[in-house]
């Protein structure tokens, strides 16, 4: 039996990260699971765009949104400008 993904509200994520919603038309209230791996994103997930030595998660935002991620947690707003007006997507910017 597969374990259900934890659910988090947008408000819980904002409190935990100190982030702010920067998307213009988001109606998302909850996320069903969190992923840092774009290959494993499922519909309803919050994708955390980590920047590492070899990869920058910001480069995979389009891919995870095509997989129906409900939101993305980002640092670099410039890399997600094309998605700021996307409906039903919460884009949350954090300092670090």
Per-segment meaning from a language model:
Residues 1-96:
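N-terminal leader/targeting and accessory segments in enzymes
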């Amino acid at each position: 039996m597969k374990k259900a993904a934890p659910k988090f509200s947008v408000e819980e994520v904002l409190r935990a990260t100190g982030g702010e919603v920067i998307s213009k038309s988001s109606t998302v209230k909850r996320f069903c699971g969190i992923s840092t791996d774009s290959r494993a994103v499922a519909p309803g997930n919050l994708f955390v765009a980590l920047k590492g030595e070899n990869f920058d998660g910001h480069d995979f935002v389009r891919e995870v949104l095509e997989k129906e991620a409900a939101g993305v947690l980002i640092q670099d707003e410039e890399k997600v400008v094309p998605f700021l007006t996307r409906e039903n997507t919460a884009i949350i910017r954090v300092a670090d």
